């Protein structure tokens, strides 16, 4: 039994499932999770002293790499002044100005402490601003664990939402409508049925919780037009894609302007931070200037703001996103080439600093239905063989992978060499 195995057994005695977020339990791939002791650059190190090339990056935030000196120095300097004040600080203003500078659609922004908090606050604001109750989300898109967002479609796109987790009343879930990602007709049909009841569309511009599914051409622009036609707000959930796909997020990359944007992950530099922002007239509807209530004890925490600012400033350096995109393309195309070499069918998607691969015979994967038909058993085999090779991927067939600027030629080549060996083994099974 490894030290990670021992720690997992110990953790299960005091922590539900032994983890503080379900995907970490390795339920999607089997076996025991690796307990991590430290991380540096492109690498993480487990409790048994094994070193891995990391393509999880704490699920997205570590875009500069782990333990980056600029972020570490900013945090240590901030700690000298105190950990939390529960009062306004100049750092919050600086952070807000930086976000607004980088994302043109955001005129005002409020800091919170998580992505879930950002999305649930943005939806409450949209409902209050429009005086409408219903929201429209997409099958396979994840926006945090707020009650109204843990809902999936029933049979057919026009079916009222059904809870996808116990503990969510059906009377509450009925206000959440679910359409098919990358299918404008399904969205139009729902709006035709509820033309004056839908407050907002919320969308992952690149769906990163059904692996990695970019929008097809015109999809986001079509959603913008539908929102304008029916007087609904468009919320782009950039918790994952914000400052990872491009300097101005996925909305900048694809050329679409939302009414509200939610942010998280990268914005915190590894600290727990979220944010929501957008049009000034909408943001002025939030307390204390408006009637929609939202608050948070640790919102705008000075340590988190310091870490986030250090990361955001580094991301404004010239050529950063071109480097990141080139590395991501190289690793994704390399995975596909290695799989094809050994006769294993694979589809890939990638954009900016995120990627996904699918064990499927289909040439392209663009929606949740296709994702659910992929070979998850083969993924689990592949996952553990790569883990044995010292490559740490997301332990789920439904999660995106993330590159960092710390991934250099050595790490990329070592990863692809490992993949070649693993695919060779899988081809012989």
Curated annotation (Swiss-Prot):
GO MF annotations, alphabetized: glutamate-1-semialdehyde 2,1-aminomutase activity; pyridoxal phosphate binding; transaminase activity
PROSITE patterns: AA_TRANSFER_CLASS_3 (PS00600)
Domain of life: Bacteria
Listed cofactors: pyridoxal 5'-phosphate
Pathway where this protein functions: Porphyrin-containing compound metabolism; protoporphyrin-IX biosynthesis; 5-aminolevulinate from L-glutamyl-tRNA(Glu): step 2/2
Enzyme Commission designation: 5.4.3.8
UniProt record, GO biological process: protoporphyrinogen IX biosynthetic process
Class of enzymatic activity (EC top level): isomerase
Record-listed N6-(pyridoxal phosphate)lysine modification sites: 265
Subcellular location: Cytoplasm
Chemical reaction(s) catalysed: (S)-4-amino-5-oxopentanoate = 5-aminolevulinate
Classification via InterPro entries: 4pyrrol_synth_GluAld_NH2Trfase, Aminotrans_3, Aminotrans_3_PPA_site, PyrdxlP-dep_Trfase, PyrdxlP-dep_Trfase_major, PyrdxlP-dep_Trfase_small
GO cellular component: cytoplasm
Keywords annotated in UniProt: Cytoplasm, Isomerase, Porphyrin biosynthesis, Pyridoxal phosphate
Subunit and interaction comment: Homodimer.
Similarity comment text for this entry: Belongs to the class-III pyridoxal-phosphate-dependent aminotransferase family. HemL subfamily.
Record HAMAP family: HemL_aminotrans_3
Protein name, as recorded: Glutamate-1-semialdehyde 2,1-aminomutase
Designated gene of the protein: hemL
């Amino acid at each position: 039994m490894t030290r990670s195995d021992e720690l997992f057994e110990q953790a299960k005695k005091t922590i539900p499932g032994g983890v503080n977020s379900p995907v970490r339990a390795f339920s999607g791939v089997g076996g025991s999770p690796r307990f991590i002791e430290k991380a540096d650059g492109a690498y993480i190190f487990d409790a048994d002293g094994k070193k891995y090339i990391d393509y999880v990056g704490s699920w997205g935030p570590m875009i500069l790499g782990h333990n980056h000196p600029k972020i570490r120095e900013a945090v240590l300097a901030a700690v000298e002044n105190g950990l939390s004040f529960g009062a306004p600080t100049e750092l919050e203003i600086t952070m807000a100005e930086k976000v607004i500078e980088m994302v043109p659609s955001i005129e005002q922004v409020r800091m919170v402490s998580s992505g879930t908090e950002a999305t649930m606050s943005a939806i409450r604001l949209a409902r209050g601003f429009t005086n409408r109750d219903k929201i429209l989300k997409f099958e396979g898109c994840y926006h945090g664990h707020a009650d109204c967002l843990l809902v999936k479609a029933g049979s057919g796109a026009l079916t009222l939402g059904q809870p996808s987790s116990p503990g969510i009343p059906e009377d509450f879930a009925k206000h959440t409508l679910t359409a098919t990602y990358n299918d404008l007709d399904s969205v139009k049909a729902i709006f035709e049925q509820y033309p004056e009841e839908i407050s907002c569309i919320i969308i992952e511009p690149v769906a990163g919780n059904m692996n990695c599914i970019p929008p097809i051409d015109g999809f986001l622009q079509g959603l913008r037009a539908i929102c304008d036609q029916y007087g609904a707000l468009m919320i782009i959930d950039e918790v994952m894609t914000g400052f990872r796909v491009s300097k101005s997020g996925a909305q900048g990359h694809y050329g679409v302007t939302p009414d509200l944007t939610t942010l998280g992950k990268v914005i915190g530099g590894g600290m727990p931070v979220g944010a929501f922002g957008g049009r000034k007239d909408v943001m002025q509807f939030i307390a204390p200037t408006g009637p929609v209530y939202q608050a948070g004890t640790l919102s705008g925490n000075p340590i988190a703001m310091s870490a986030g600012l250090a990361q955001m400033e580094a991301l404004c350096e010239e050529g950063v996103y071109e480097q990141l995109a080139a590395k991501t393309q190289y690793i994704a195309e390399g995975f596909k080439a290695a799989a094809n070499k050994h006769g294993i069918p694979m589809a890939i998607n990638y954009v900016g600093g995120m990627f996904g691969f699918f064990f499927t015979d289909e040439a392209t994967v663009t929606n949740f239905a296709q994702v659910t038909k992929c070979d998850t058993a083969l993924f689990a085999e592949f996952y553990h063989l790569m883990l044995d090779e010292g490559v740490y991927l997301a332990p789920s067939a439904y999660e995106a992978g993330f590159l960092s600027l710390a991934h250099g030629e050595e790490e990329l080549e070592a990863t692809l060499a490992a993949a070649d060996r693993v695919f060779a083994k899988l081809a012989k099974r």
